[in-house]
């Protein structure tokens, strides 16, 4: 049995593939905006590190491990970058840039470990966006991306900073990181994107055009 593909079908398939490839291709404006987001949030990361001691101490005293919830501020860059740029690698790139900036300004945890944490946390958010094939950018996905980044943060911290921690501490820390990641990184990033879109700052991005057509 011989099968043949009509020129029309071949052309349609080629067009679909080309459109998908173009949609995922980074533009100069994508790189610039992702970098700006990374730098801006990197300064926030650094500032959060400066006040971290007074903030985390009473929370940790209340329940050891609970301090992972506010630590989720350090995973917001990846979710925000992913929601704005909507391209493969955006979450990872933005979180990594933020970590590098924070490390360059000065991090109490050391430059290399700060950058390593950014890499891991960015991958956590990136994985969630990849699972949805970079096609779904709704609120639940933003929450899941934040939760994924929070989970990655918890695993990384438990391996590097809390090795041998008691099971109860590890459980509380992980749950707190996931919930904090979802609410702080996912929720706040989603709200930030909507605010920027309404202000017209994202008109060159699908995130901005999409909201304006609703």
Where are each of the predicted segments found?
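Short helix-perturbing small/polar motifs within transmembrane alpha-helices
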Residues: 38, 116-158, 190
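Aromatic-anchored segments of alpha-helical transmembrane domains
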Residues: 38-46, 96-105, 147-157
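Hydrophobic transmembrane alpha-helices
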Residues: 2-4, 18-81
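Membrane-helix boundary connector in multi-pass membrane proteins
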Residues: 159-171
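Hydrophobic alpha-helical transmembrane segments
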Residues: 31-36, 72, 76, 88-96, ...
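Short, highly charged, low-complexity non-transmembrane loops/tails of multi-pass membrane proteins
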Residues: 196-214
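Membrane-water interface at the C-terminal end of transmembrane alpha helices
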Residues: 130-135, 183-200
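Interfacial aromatic-anchored transmembrane helix boundaries in multi-pass membrane proteins
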Residues: 98-127
């Amino acid at each position: 049995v011989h099968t043949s593909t009509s020129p029309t079908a071949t052309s349609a398939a080629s067009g679909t593939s080309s459109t998908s490839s173009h949609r995922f291709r980074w533009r100069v404006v994508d790189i610039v905006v992702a970098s700006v987001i990374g730098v801006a949030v990197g300064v926030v990361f650094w500032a959060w590190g400066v006040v971290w001691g007074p903030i985390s101490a009473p929370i940790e005293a209340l329940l050891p491990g609970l301090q992972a919830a506010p630590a989720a501020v350090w995973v917001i860059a990846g979710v925000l970058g992913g929601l704005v740029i909507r391209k493969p690698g955006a979450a990872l790139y933005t979180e990594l840039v933020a970590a590098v900036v924070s490390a360059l300004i000065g991090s109490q945890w050391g430059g290399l470990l700060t950058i390593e944490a950014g890499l891991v946390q960015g991958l956590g958010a990136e994985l969630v966006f990849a699972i949805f094939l970079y096609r779904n950018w709704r609120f639940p996905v933003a929450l899941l991306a934040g939760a994924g980044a929070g989970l990655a943060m918890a695993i990384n911290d438990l391996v590097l900073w809390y090795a041998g921690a008691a099971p109860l501490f590890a459980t509380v820390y992980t749950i707190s990181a996931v919930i904090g990641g979802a609410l702080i990184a996912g929720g706040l990033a989603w709200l930030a994107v909507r605010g920027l879109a309404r202000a017209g700052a994202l008109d060159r991005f699908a995130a901005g055009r999409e909201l304006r057509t609703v």
